[in-house]
């Protein structure tokens, strides 16, 4: 024991336990919240494999994110039931954008339902919203750990998130394929990728795919400059261009972010979409060149995770179950350099990890 304060277990101490004891066998819950992400199943597999085989824990999987513990929808997870899931995309537990903090008596409902399942703690795998809820629940006294995931790679407290590498590979392959049709038809092809607040996917896939312009949320763009770069390529005899744009990118005056039906989820996020189509119309009208838009959308979330994402997700899952064994509630395993370290959950949601100006400036060398 290291002397750090421990949050009490949900399960009342039995005759075998006088109180929280490091390395005792425990009963843990696990859930996956928010958008699905390649590598989620690798985390689940690692938690179950080490939790059951090494620590002797019992593992419960909640269905559909925070909705599972709110509605007591769960299943027992075993080594056998999680075999073969390592290469699978998505999550065997399902997911949702349910926000327990927005539900009437949500905290007390969670506390009551987790006690009813006789849990000692809960591991929440998710992004900004899921981990934000987990951090708030920890402050309410619930024994919760987090595992960071997002294809957007924008979580604070960690140098990288699993799912990002797979998303970049998918987007890069799409850009490679679109190059051939753009060149064949002398078209401007706009490729819209995910990235609400951070342009990591756009930047990395654009660089890897040889994009001629990359637009990200961190750098409001000048549509006139975008058109100038495209026209310069034409003047040099390059009659096609690839423009990669993150869904959250906006022009300098902030008027081209387009919302899909104005809908929001339970965490208050508006549904983004349409920036690619607006760019297509603006570029065609300003340059006279034929333009087309491809929105990659959810294909970036799906499919088989890359080897890098499988390994990172596995390492995070192993670290999470070890932290739960040591009752390190309110913490989150994070990638720091090449090491996995525990950091406070609050660090993950304190601020977004965005693209540094120098990274974007390096990409600008290849524009036009």
Model-assigned labels for residue ranges:
Residues 10-11, 16, 21, 69-124, ...:
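Glycine-rich oxoanion-binding loops at beta->alpha junctions
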Residues 267, 271-368:
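C-terminal non-catalytic interaction/assembly regions of soluble proteins
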Residues 27-35, 91-96, 121-124, 189-192, ...:
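Short glycine-rich or small-residue beta-strand-to-loop segments that form or flank ligand, phosphate
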Residues 124-126, 136, 164-182, 189-289:
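Accessory alpha-helical/coil subdomains and C-terminal extensions
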């Amino acid at each position: 024991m290291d002397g750090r304060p421990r949050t009490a277990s949900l399960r009342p101490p039995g005759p075998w336990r006088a109180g929280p004891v490091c390395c005792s066998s425990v009963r843990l819950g696990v859930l996956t919240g928010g958008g699905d992400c390649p590598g989620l199943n690798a985390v689940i597999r690692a938690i179950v494999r080490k939790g059951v085989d090494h620590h002797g824990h019992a593992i419960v999987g909640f269905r559909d994110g925070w909705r599972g513990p709110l509605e007591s929808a769960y299943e027992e997870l075993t080594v056998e039931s999680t075999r073969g899931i390592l290469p699978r995309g998505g999550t065997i537990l399902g997911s949702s954008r349910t926000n327990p903090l927005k539900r009437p008596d949500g905290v007390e409902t969670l506390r009551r339902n987790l006690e009813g399942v006789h849990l000692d703690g809960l591991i929440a795998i998710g992004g900004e919203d899921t981990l934000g809820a987990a951090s708030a629940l920890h402050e309410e006294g619930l024994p919760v750990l987090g595992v960071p995931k997002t294809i957007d790679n924008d979580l604070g407290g960690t140098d990288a998130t699993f799912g990002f590498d797979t998303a970049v590979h998918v987007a890069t392959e799409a850009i490679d394929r679109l190059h051939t049709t753009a060149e064949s038809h002398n078209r401007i092809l706009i490729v819209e990728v995910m990235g609400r607040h951070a342009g990591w996917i756009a930047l990395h896939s654009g660089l890897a795919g040889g994009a001629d312009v990359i637009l990200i949320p961190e750098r409001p763009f000048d549509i006139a400059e975008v058109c100038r770069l495209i026209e310069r390529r034409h003047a040099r005899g390059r009659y096609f261009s690839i423009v990669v744009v993150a869904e959250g990118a906006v022009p300098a005056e902030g008027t081209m972010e387009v919302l899909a039906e104005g809908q929001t989820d339970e965490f208050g996020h508006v549904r983004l979409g349409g920036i690619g189509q607006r760019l297509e119309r603006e570029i065609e009208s300003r340059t006279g060149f034929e333009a087309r838009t491809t929105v990659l959308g959810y294909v970036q979330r799906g499919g088989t995770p890359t080897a890098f994402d499988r390994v990172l997700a596995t390492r995070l899952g192993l670290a999470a179950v070890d932290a739960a064994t040591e009752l390190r509630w309110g913490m989150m395993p994070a990638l720091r350099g090449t090491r996995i370290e525990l950091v406070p959950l609050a660090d993950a949601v304190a601020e977004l990890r965005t693209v540094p100006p120098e990274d974007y400036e390096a990409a600008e060398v290849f524009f036009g």
